[in-house]
Regions:
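P-loop NTP-binding module
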Residues: 1-307
């Protein structure tokens, strides 16, 4: 049984009464231990299954690829950023880690789903704060961009934005400023040369975030951005207790729900799942757990040392 299901059962979440999608085909387990902590399951859990990404990619190549974005967003400003280990953006800082492998596999799954349904704009959210949705959003954007696809990461949490700060971008004009402006064309988008994707930061948190999002300007912006990019990843606010995410859900093609092992409880997860249309739920990403074989994973698959 998938470790996702194991974790849900340990938390009693299998009793929520909500039917989950096929986690084996649309979700990923992110083995990421919090700083300075080890998993309570480390001594008893078995090794994680080996993921053969090459086989999955070969299967995916047999399908007809969706139409790529044709208009290069070259008019947007390019920024040099320094991604540090503290940022936890493992697609840059730890590309050979098992955590990065899990994100790459999630990217493979998303591409596979796109062969059977329209999928370009992905909403990443969680039931409550502090479950790691922003970290997942950035890493998903990073692994998708590694395939030379044009990826835009939108910092859609106008109330408590964190992504721009974690990338060291400072106070840049972003989504909030565009929504308040009279501009008719998309702006306040920046290409991050290191990570390889574009980002639209939230900007300065406005007092009327929900009112701005419901003004009609946001849908106008998304209509402009959709043909410019192959993927648009939206890091949204938590589902509870705000209504902001329901606005984003109407403008995106599918939702990834982030849950954190040891943090996410049954009641808020149930309420969060009930707020997502079943047809929109791509899967659940389990965050904050440790694979006991993490340190030895790539040692087994590395070339032998030269003697």
């Amino acid at each position: 049984m998938s470790r996702i299901f194991d974790a849900l059962q340990r938390s009693g979440l299998e009793q929520t009464g909500v039917e989950y999608p096929d986690m084996m085909t649309v979700a990923a387990e992110v083995f990421e231990a919090p700083h300075g902590q080890t998993s309570a399951n480390q001594a008893t859990a078995g090794p994680a299954p080996v993921i053969d990404e090459q086989v999955a990619l070969a299967e995916m190549a047999k399908a007809i690829m969706p139409e790529r974005a044709t208009d290069a967003p070259g008019e947007f400003r390019s920024l040099e950023v320094c991604v540090t280990a503290a940022s936890r953006f493992v697609f840059v800082t730890e590309p050979d880690s098992l955590v990065a492998e899990k994100f790459r596999f999630l990217g493979v799954r998303l591409r596979q789903i796109r062969h059977s349904r329209s999928l370009k704009k992905i909403l990443v959210t969680s039931a409550i704060p502090q479950e790691g949705k922003s970290l997942v959003s950035a890493n998903v954007a990073g692994v998708l961009a590694r395939r030379k696809e044009k990826v835009l990461l939108i910092e859609g949490d106008l109330r408590r934005p964190v992504l721009a700060q974690q990338f060291g971008l400072g106070r840049l004009a972003g989504l909030a400023e565009w929504l308040q402006s009279g501009l008719q064309t998309a702006s306040n988008i920046y290409h991050l040369s290191g990570p390889g994707f574009w980002i639209m930061p939230a900007g300065d948190p406005p007092l009327n975030a929900l009112e701005l999002m419901q003004s009609g300007r946001l849908s106008q912006l998304m209509e402009q951005l959709t043909p410019l990019f192959d993927w648009i990843i939206v890091d949204s606010p938590p589902l509870l207790p705000l209504a902001d995410t329901t606005v984003w859900a109407r403008m995106t093609d599918g939702t990834l729900l982030v849950a954190r092992e040891g943090i996410t409880e049954k009641a808020p997860l149930q309420r969060g799942l009930e707020m997502i249309k079943k047809s929109d739920l791509l899967g659940i990403v389990l965050n904050g757990c440790m694979n006991p074989d993490h340190k030895n994973y790539y040692r087994r698959y590395s070339p032998p040392a030269v003697k």
